[in-house]
Amino acid sequence: MAERNPFTPAFGTVPPIMAGRDRLLAELHAALEQGVGDPNLSSILVGARGTGKTACLTRLCEDASDAGWVSASSSAIPGLLDDILQQAQRASAQLVKPKPQRQLTGLSVGPLGASWDMGDEERGNWRTRMSALLEGLNARDVGLLITVDEVDASLSELITMAVVYQHFVRERRKVALLMAGLPSHVHALLNDKSVSFLRRAQRHPLGTIADADVRDALKRTVASGGKTIDEEALGICVEATGGFPYMLQLVGYRSWQSALGKAEVGKEDARAGMRAAQEDFREHVLASTYRELSAVDLRFAKAMLP
């Protein structure tokens, strides 16, 4: 039987151990437990690529049901509003029975015909349909957690969603909105006058992780897969991660692969894993970040070089 690698560098995959994010996750989970009125129910996770924003959103959605919530997850792409509505309807299907979409209001003979009333909710806009869903959920004391990844201020649907969410909060609906994005994208969103109220949302910067937390996560993850890791190898891996959650998973994954068939991850495995992970990081993270830089950003970056 092939060895199962316990590290998870795949995009959006939640690692078994969320290094350095315990306090943040506990704080946001407590907000769901507290319910209406907690300021963290409107939060924005801000961080560079590889800092674990998507993984945090995913973990919170997984935990939401324990606090009496259903969740609807999406990304800031065209079709956002419909996607949130459909995900919310699907998540609440066992709790809220949909009302008949149309009723027969008239019947004529010769020629045979019928007239139908589609109902207020079916004719209504996104706010009307979401309000009906929230009423059904809130009647059972169930909240709706909406998460939006990769925020993009240029997407009009994101602005619409945020404005409507503000009305839900004013109406004291049991609803939460957690968003995540790159610093420049979040800055652009908060500068949009239509959603200036989002400036009062809780902002949680996701920076690098302390070496002690990285070391602990690496050691525990290796142990969960049935191996041990040499202390020197552990030091090499910790230094190679640079405190980035994605690099933690990547270095761990590559080092484990190098140690297949062995009981221990040694220093040579760690060095091989470090080299492979650094190449992956350059290709998948740094190159993407570089391509997004403006001409002004590039001139500034070059000026900072020694």
Task: Give the positions of each predicted feature.
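A short, basic N-terminal segment
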Residues: 1-41, 87-90, 94-97, 104-105
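Walker A/P-loop nucleotide-binding motif
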Residues: 37-59
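Conserved catalytic segments around the Walker B and adjacent sensor/switch elements
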Residues: 44, 61-80
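Conserved NTP-binding/hydrolysis module of P-loop NTPases
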Residues: 65-70, 81-114
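Conserved Walker B catalytic segment
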Residues: 117-185, 191-194
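A short helix-turn-beta junction within AAA+ P-loop NTPase domains corresponding to the substrate/partner-engaging
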Residues: 191-207
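Conserved small helical "lid"/interfacial subdomain of P-loop NTPases
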Residues: 206-233, 240, 251
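Winged-helix-like regulatory helical subdomains adjacent to P-loop NTPase cores
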Residues: 249-306
